Amino acid sequence: GGTSAWSGGMIWVPNNPHMIAAGIKDSREEALTYLQSLSHDLIRPELAESFVDHGPEMVSWLEENTSVKFQLVADFPDYHPEHPGGKPTGGRSLECPLISFNDLGDNKDRVTVGYNYGTAPITMKESHLGSAVPIKVSATEHTRRAENDERGCGQALIGHLYRACLEAEIEITTSARAVELITENGRVTGVVIKKDEEELVVHARGGVILGTGGFEWNRELVRDFLRGPMTSPVSVPTNEGDGLVMCMRIGAALGNMREAWWMPAVEAPGDRGDGLNPTYL
């Protein structure tokens, strides 16, 4: 795991309550038009509608019922604002505020740290990636945050969610690899996990949500699916397509398999993909 913890930590939610509160106009129709244009009309309308309709509800529910909080990444535009329904001035991107990992107690070391953002005590809107003119953080404030182990970006997103899980007494199992989906009468009812060389069965009442990252470190899947070579992945090295493989084994339908979040990269000599050395320039 660790894809989200290594990331910039932003979530994309059209018509979210924070942009509405800031006076930024958006609508269900604009968001659906944007998604339809981006997908070249290949998107499943019912899935797009569910995402657009329930995304703002998700943000409100988390903030009202847990300690998770979000804030606008001011002026961060949609990735393709030139498409119909796109927002060139931003508003749809949210991030979690800084969080002290001391709040997680003995659990804080269970959150993996990547080399993209590390444990940097800054938010996206305070970085050059999140703003053309980032909010300046004084050296004194930066030191205070570091001493309090305050983290931003993907660490903040996972930190907020993890803290909420701990407060709700939700059990989190780490170092446990999902290896097989259990099906009964055409429905997924559980998952087999492997922990410490032992296979355990976890049954699900409502279903199984797969959040297993990508498959960019699986050379066979990259060769079979992507539209071009990927020579230098810059993500968690354990992203080997476990969820995808499990789905294919039970005959799940696949779609949009040729694309990735492409970016130019130059692999640094001696890189081991574990964050000990920079992996791209």
Where are the predicted features?
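Flexible glycine/proline-enriched surface loops and loop-helix/loop-strand junctions
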Residues: Y34-P45, R227-M230
